[in-house]
């Protein structure tokens, strides 16, 4: 597999085999050192409590802000995953064990999990489910729970891009479903 880097001498784009420690430019003979690969961050998913969008975030995050509806979702680990067949299209759905219902991403039908449930299976990598807090509009009589306190250290914002499965629009064309979110990690 090949990678690319910009020559530090003449600014040309150089191609080189992945894993090479340095690259010699054929034009200016400058040797450009290849930086070490970026550390791989473990990622997890949760469904936004405000708009039901699938969000991806780094595993060490305490909260995840949805870029679609600005809901701050609290992250809590879930150790078991259960399965249920969609009540409409019969697709097998995965959900955190103990959830009262699950919405099918294909047909949008909401299935109660108390029926047709397969026993939970231990998750090989813990996934996360989020609870959320939305600030009510000013002047509203909505009684929301108080927000949780923020971490004491300065969090670092990380932009996260999630590419969901493609769908077909009314004209029969494939549509990409990409969501961009911001997560606050430690």
Swiss-Prot record:
<dbReference type="GO" id="GO:0005634">
    <property type="term" value="C:nucleus"/>
</dbReference>
<feature type="compositionally biased region" description="Polar residues">
    <location>
        <begin position="133"/>
        <end position="143"/>
    </location>
</feature>
<feature type="region of interest" description="Putative zinc finger 2">
    <location>
        <begin position="45"/>
        <end position="75"/>
    </location>
</feature>
<dbReference type="InterPro" id="IPR005735">
    <property type="entry name" value="Znf_LSD1"/>
</dbReference>
<comment type="function">
    <text>Putative zinc finger that may be involved in programmed cell death and defense response.</text>
</comment>
<protein>
    <recommendedName>
        <fullName>Protein LOL3</fullName>
    </recommendedName>
</protein>
<feature type="region of interest" description="Putative zinc finger 3">
    <location>
        <begin position="83"/>
        <end position="113"/>
    </location>
</feature>
<feature type="region of interest" description="Disordered">
    <location>
        <begin position="120"/>
        <end position="157"/>
    </location>
</feature>
<dbReference type="Pfam" id="PF06943">
    <property type="entry name" value="zf-LSD1"/>
</dbReference>
<dbReference type="InterPro" id="IPR040319">
    <property type="entry name" value="LSD1-like"/>
</dbReference>
<keyword id="KW-0539">Nucleus</keyword>
<feature type="region of interest" description="Putative zinc finger 1">
    <location>
        <begin position="4"/>
        <end position="34"/>
    </location>
</feature>
